[in-house]
């Protein structure tokens, strides 16, 4: 990865993993990294040519790094790709502007499976409340002051009932298209720079990080994830070149 990836600052539009540990280098072959002019996000590889992230991670210039672990020391199989096509779920309701925060990106060239690159499966069912899920990313590992690591951090968090997020964020309309996850006592959370990254529950990808409180990792302040289970028909239709497919209602 180029030197400019060793950033010490990112805008508050991105989110982090606090309270976790360095991910095992072999546990995240599907995890990709987007770095663009001080902003960075996580992405998830779902097949050789397509990745998922949050719609709010969209930028004009979007280099996507795959097969990456240590930002300052490239893996032999690390590659860079750029978006060929981007697809989002349009949502014109300002009140629900964070609803449907998902973007499907076609890479400019396919990637090959390798030691550090492999896709993850889409969900075929909903994870149950109480599930232990895994979050990961290169986001800040401290709060409220940010510290950005050279390696991705991973943490185990719990999946909660939607009412927990309703109670935590009264001003925020938690919809059925979101998953609510965190650690109620605090201390573990996603954070600055983790936006767009995956929520992994029992094997498959189940969510895309799109919103959390600032500062991160406070007690009783879980984060919100776009619910992956709602989107496979939309994703598969677009991949099959039915680009007029409408999003879930």
UniProtKB/Swiss-Prot annotation:
Its EC number is 3.4.21.-. Optimum temperature is 40 degrees Celsius. Disulfide bonds join 23-154, 41-57, 89-247, 133-201, 165-180, 191-216. Glycans are attached at residues 145, 161, 242. GO terms for cellular component: extracellular region; secretory granule. Residues 1-10 form the signal peptide. Negative results: does not degrade beta- and gamma-chains of fibrinogen (FGB). Does not hydrolyze the plasmin substrate S2251 (D-Val-Leu-Lys-pNA). Monomer. This is Thrombin-like enzyme barnettobin.
